[in-house]
């Protein structure tokens, strides 16, 4: 947990910017070592891979591959019409991606990591602001992927 400073800002040993896999690993390891940690992201927690990239892509490609495979096997005795019903496939994908942000936030809370939502803006060498809330830190980890 953070320690308040005389000016009202919170102080952490580490502030992590980004909330994807790399950010989570860094935050959890530092917290496990007994240090105070905060994590901030302007998007839902989970990162690109879990929410918008790798994982959902695999689910969508799985449906496309199944249709393609059946169609290519049609001359070899596999019969029947197959098609992707996009609303159902998207519901399937969302059944995996929608719970991710809440699970991440719950995990951070259980470990004593403070979670912030918003855009982190550096205000000094060891300080930043998130939607008007000031944080000070000893170390910062920018784990924001390509952004």
Question: Where do the model's predicted regions map?
Answer:
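Glycine-rich Rossmann-fold phosphate-binding loop(s) that bind the pyrophosphate
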Residues: 18-21, 42-43
């Amino acid at each position: 947990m953070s320690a308040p400073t005389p000016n009202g800002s919170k102080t952490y040993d580490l502030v992590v910017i980004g909330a994807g896999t790399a950010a989570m690993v860094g935050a959890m390891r530092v917290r496990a070592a007994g240090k105070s940690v905060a994590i901030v992201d302007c998007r839902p927690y989970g990162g690109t891979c879990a929410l918008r990239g790798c994982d959902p892509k695999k689910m969508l490609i799985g449906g496309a591959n199944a249709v393609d495979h059946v169609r290519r096997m049609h001359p070899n005795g596999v019969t029947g019409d197959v098609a992707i019903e996009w609303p159902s496939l998207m519901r399937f994908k969302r059944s995996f991606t929608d719970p991710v942000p809440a699970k991440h936030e719950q995990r951070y809370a259980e470990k004593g990591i403070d979670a912030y939502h918003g855009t982190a803006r550096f205000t000094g060498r060891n300080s930043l602001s998130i939607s008007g809330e000031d944080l000070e830190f000893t170390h910062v980890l920018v784990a924001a992927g390509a952004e």
